[in-house]
Regions:
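Secreted/extracellular small peptides and ectodomain modules produced from precursors
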Residues: 1-2, 21-23, 150
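Bacterial N-terminal signal peptides
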Residues: 12-23
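Bacterial N-terminal signal peptides that target proteins for export
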Residues: 1-14
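A structural boundary/capping signal
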Residues: 25-251
């Protein structure tokens, strides 16, 4: 088939374009195509130009001993934030105070993660719950995983340890023994003290509650002990504020 003379320049341009594009894609990265390896943790040289700036920031950042010291007041956070709402948006669709928005977002994400953990362990418990024998021996996390399950004493360690591994503070996440006064039944749950007076409850098996309610929302059970790997507290009714837990003073 014959082509007109005008067709050949167009074909040449089209062909050159494909070649250029093809070379551009294939030519990214090192010439050999081999992956680049880095040593990420070498000490800086004595004359490194970044060192003074980095060390100046490190010194100022270490002066803040606890991020919670930056937390705004509940009044500035607003009712939506304290009840689990999102960031506050000002008039005209503009965002409000960055400090309030940061802590509101952080609280919202932590609650969402904790609720996911509660839903997950309550689902897994249906397949991995192993009743206690004649003598109850509390399993460690290692033993619970090795045995592919445990009673509430072992299963509770999974959400508890997950929250700690995910960055929740060790002074806000505790194991707790709860008791049902109607029949003396005891149970193990995780308490997350986002609110020091009314913690969230994560029940691994659903024997006490499902989801992640506040302790004040769970009827028929009372906390007896609060503890971790390193500390142990006994829970008493707070005579200063009836109905709240007397644990803040013991920390």
């Amino acid at each position: 088939m014959l082509r007109s003379a005008a067709t050949f320049p167009l074909l040449r341009v089209f062909t050159l374009t494909l070649v250029v594009l093809g070379c551009g894609c294939a030519g990214t990265g090192p010439g050999t195509g081999a992956p680049v390896h880095y040593r990420f943790f070498d000490p800086p040289d004595s004359n490194d130009i970044w060192t003074p700036t980095i060390r100046g920031w490190q010194s100022r950042e270490r002066a803040l001993t606890d991020t919670e010291l930056l937390r705004p007041t509940e009044a500035s956070l607003g009712a939506r934030v304290s009840e689990g709402g999102g960031a506050t948006i000002g008039s005209g669709g503009t965002h409000g105070d960055l400090r309030a928005e940061y802590f509101a977002f952080r609280a919202e994400r932590k609650r969402a993660l904790a609720r996911d953990v509660a839903a997950w362990i309550q689902s897994e418990a249906r397949h991995h719950y192993i009743p206690n024998g004649p003598i109850a021996r509390w399993a460690t996390l290692e033993e619970t995983l090795a045995n592919n399950g445990a009673s509430c004493n072992g299963l509770e360690l999974l959400p508890n340890r997950f929250l700690l591994d995910a960055g929740f503070r060790p002074d806000e996440v505790y194991r707790a023994i709860v008791m049902r006064p109607s029949d003396g039944q005891h149970h193990m749950v995780t308490l997350w003290f986002e609110n020091p007076d009314d913690p969230w409850v994560i029940d691994p098996t659903g024997a006490m509650t499902t989801g992640m309610p506040h302790l004040s929302e769970v009827a028929g059970w009372v906390p007896v002990k609060v503890f971790s790997e390193y500390v142990e507290y006994t829970v008493h009714p707070d005579t200063v504020a009836p109905g709240s837990l007397a644990i803040r003073q013991a920390r």
